[in-house]
A protein has these predicted regions:
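Expand to "…catalyze enediolate/carbanion chemistry for C-C bond making/breaking, isomerization
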Residues: 1-101
Length: 101
């Protein structure tokens, strides 16, 4: 994260992918018993998303599921990695899209 601003400003960067497990390993932390990530992990995610938006870089986060897809559609992402069919179904219903999209 120390060079995030400079990295995202490089011409030609089109996408940044973020994953909570990788970020957790970088920090040496793990999810709590309820499956929630520590605040430092979500803060890092939010910072990366903020810089990506500012620089016009697509933000792609792993871990999209049925419980967070609507929030991600409405406020943040363009590219999604679905954890299961439920996430795709909920997202399609929310956006009015039909298969194969």
């Amino acid at each position: 994260l120390e060079v995030l601003d400079q990295t995202m400003a490089v011409p030609g960067i089109g996408m940044v992918e973020w994953g909570p497990a990788d970020m957790s390993m970088s920090y040496g932390v793990a999810r709590d018993p309820n499956g929630n990530y520590p605040k430092m992990v979500t803060d890092a995610r939010n910072r990366i998303l903020e810089v990506a938006k500012r620089e016009g870089v697509v933000f792609s986060a792993v871990g999209t599921n049925g419980s967070n897809i609507i929030d991600r559609i409405d406020r943040e992402q363009i590219l999604f990695h679905f954890a299961n069919e439920e996430a795709a179904r909920v997202g399609r219903r929310h956006t009015g899209r039909v298969m194969p999209y």
